[in-house]
């Protein structure tokens, strides 16, 4: 269930002028409560033998502080992996999020979390025209999939510069982790998935039917990621991808 701020934004966008206080009062009267995000849990498995000396550490601003923002879509991206329990075993989900719009521009799901999982997520972003033609920055944790020679070679071949945070430090990949928290509190924890297919379908519907297209995002002044992208394209006279 969405919180009162999200519901207020959605109602206002649909012409229903109402305050967050009023929405909160109505929710209390009806006994409706938003689902709270669960505590962050590290799922990274690093590879101490991986050669990462040429991969840059963090995405920092001119003051040396973490900077997970972007003004141009397709230039700065973040990615991570989470796991979803189903009746037929674990299903692993890798995502790629655009920092300019917070849109999930690529994702991949599989019964294992080997390197092709994360390559396929970035390949989806590339194939859908979501990577800037002059190159992009991709930030992740130090999971073995992201430090593998196969992934590093793929990034180099697609004009992607890798950045990485520290192992086990949640703030270093907070944007990606935040999306997973929303996915699980707003959708996943409401269902008991019998198999991979049912979970795959639900995840796809959540991402494209709700999160990207309709869910208000505070980073976009209340616009959904898709609407934020459209606003950028209209502002600069760009054709929709």
Each model region followed by its residue ranges:
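Basic, flexible linker segments flanking DNA-binding modules
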Residues: 1-71, 169, 224-234
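RNase H-like two-metal-ion nuclease catalytic core shared by retroviral integrases
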Residues: 44-46, 140-142, 148-151, 164-184, ...
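An active-site-proximal beta-strand-loop segment
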Residues: 61-105, 111
